[in-house]
Amino acid sequence: MASTVSAANLKVKIIEEVILNGKDQGGTTELTIGSITNVVKRIVNIGTDEIGLLGFGTAYNTELSKTYLAGQFDEDTVRYIRITNLDDTNHIALILKNENNDEFGVKVDKGCSFIYGVDLDGGVVDTMVSADAAGITPDSFGDLVDITCAANTAACDVEVFVAST
């Protein structure tokens, strides 16, 4: 059966609104990402123990040793990732890991979002590295394979939005 889903554009708009001393200091940034054919939008409940949130691998990868609350995705086709902490009290911690077992963490405070900067032509391939400043070069990035998450004090609802080609 042939797909009846037509590719579409994802329009991402970030708006800052602030007036200081009577002058508008805000700004708007827009990005259009073409050829989107798949969108996953989920709200998941994250406890205080670290748990798999998103997984990435090659299309032929059958490694399913880990469970991911929001799903597993083909690393080559992901074009946009947004993770929003919907809680009004607690922060969450995101831990991102690449194929070289490099990890880095990001605190996402109550009501805040984290947008992962994918490669608009190559997905999450060669987009993540963690090392001291002297160890990072333009060619040292590895494939993002894993995003795990934990809440700091009490469970938090987290919205995950992933768009793919």
Residues covered by each model-derived region:
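Surface-exposed, low-hydrophobicity beta-strand/loop segments enriched in small/polar/acidic residues
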Residues: 2-165
